[in-house]
Every structure is written in structure tokens, then in C-alpha cells.
């Protein structure tokens, strides 16, 4: 990945999957995120985070958002597309957030102006049900705490299912090395046979 970031034209928009990577299940470590940030800064790339599975990697919203916070603290201007379709079970409701992070007030105003134009022309009246559910969960302390517990349960179940699949494949003597199943994170797994 580092080689690809270095080879990309300076100032490229780089889409980064925040956590529980789809389709590989392979997430960068914190040390790898630091290196990714260094290369993105050197090449003057623009990071755009896809945050579709927050909470599914570790069961902890804050832990899963570490890379975004690191980039923000490092002073990056960036975008984050955050979906609540999976982690709040709001499939088909189009519930999510778009975050633009900048330390420049003029840039923020310009981006907001463009987003308002796009929103008005593209989705003048978005579905409200999913947004209201998400807002209720995010703004009510009791619901928010319950949601965080549910995410821990779901991610724990995913981890347990990975272990059980791995153990069954080993028990059956299935040819190959299946350790990637328990090393990967989230709902997705990629196995490449060369």
C-alpha cells in the first residue's frame, strides 16, 4: 500500500477504509496508519475515509475511529463518509454523515456552500426515518450506551465465528493454511491462493 501511495500522482484523493476492511478483513495497525499518514503528507494527498463498519472491528467505536482522529490531530484536511446502515442496522435508510475536516475557516465555508448546493439538487428531501433513528441513538445517553454494548456483542460474535470456522477447517484436515481467518477483522475475509 505504501508503494501505491508513493506512486500516486501528488495531490491525489486517497480513499481509506477506516476499519473492518471490505473485502479483505485486513486493517492497518496503528503503526502502519502512522506510516500511511506520513506518505500522504509527503505526497500532499487528500485522505477520504470510508467509515462503513465502525464498531465491527474491535467492538469499540473510539478504537475503530483511531485513524481518523490521528489524521485530524496531525492537521490533515480530509473527508469522512460515515454510514449507519450496518452498525445501526439501518439498511436501505441512507442514514449517515459526511464530515469535512479543515482548520481553515474560509475553506470550511466554501465546502459547506458546495455541499448545500449538492444536497439541494441531488437529495432535496432525503428519507427521514433512518436519520431520526440514528439521531435518537446518538443523542440519548441510554440508547447510545446500549448501542455500544450491542456493537461489542456483534464484534465478539464475529470473532467467535471466525475462531469456530478456523477450528472446523483444521479439524476436518482441510488443505491449506487457514490462519488468515482469525488474523483478519470484521465480517469480511480474503484468501488469495498463489
Can you name each region flagged by the protein language model?
Residues 25-30, 57-65, 91-92:
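A short acidic (Asp/Glu
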Residues 29, 33, 64-68, 112, ...:
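Amphipathic alpha-helical segments in well-structured domains
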Residues 73-148:
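Conserved core segment of the aminotransferase class I/II
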Residues 146-194:
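Conserved PLP-binding catalytic core of the aspartate aminotransferase-like
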Amino acid at each position: 500500500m505504501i508503494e501505491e501511495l508513493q506512486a500516486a500522482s501528488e495531490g491525489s484523493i486517497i480513499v481509506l477504509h477506516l476499519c473492518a476492511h471490505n473485502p479483505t478483513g485486513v486493517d492497518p495497525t496503528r503503526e502502519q496508519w502512522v506510516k500511511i499518514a506520513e506518505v500522504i503528507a509527503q505526497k500532499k494527498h487528500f485522505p477520504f475515509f470510508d467509515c462503513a463498519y465502525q464498531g465491527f472491528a474491535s467492538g469499540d467505536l473510539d478504537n475503530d475511529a483511531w485513524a481518523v482522529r490521528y489524521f485530524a490531530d496531525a492537521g490533515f484536511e480530509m473527508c469522512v463518509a460515515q454510514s449507519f446502515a450496518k452498525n445501526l442496522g439501518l439498511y436501505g435508510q441512507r442514514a449517515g454523515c459526511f464530515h469535512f475536516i479543515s482548520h481553515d475557516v474560509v475553506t470550511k465555508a466554501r465546502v459547506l456552500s458546495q455541499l448545500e448546493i449538492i444536497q439541494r439538487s441531488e437529495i432535496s428531501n432525503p428519507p427521514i426515518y433512518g436519520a431520526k433513528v440514528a439521531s435518537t441513538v446518538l443523542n440519548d445517553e441510554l440508547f447510545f450506551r446500549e448501542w455500544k454494548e450491542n456493537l461489542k456483542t456483534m464484534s465478539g460474535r464475529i470473532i467467535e465465528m471466525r475462531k469456530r470456522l478456523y477450528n472446523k477447517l483444521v479439524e476436518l484436515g482441510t488443505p491449506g493454511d487457514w490462519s488468515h481467518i482469525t488474523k483478519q477483522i470484521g465480517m469480511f475475509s480474503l484468501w488469495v491462493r498463489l
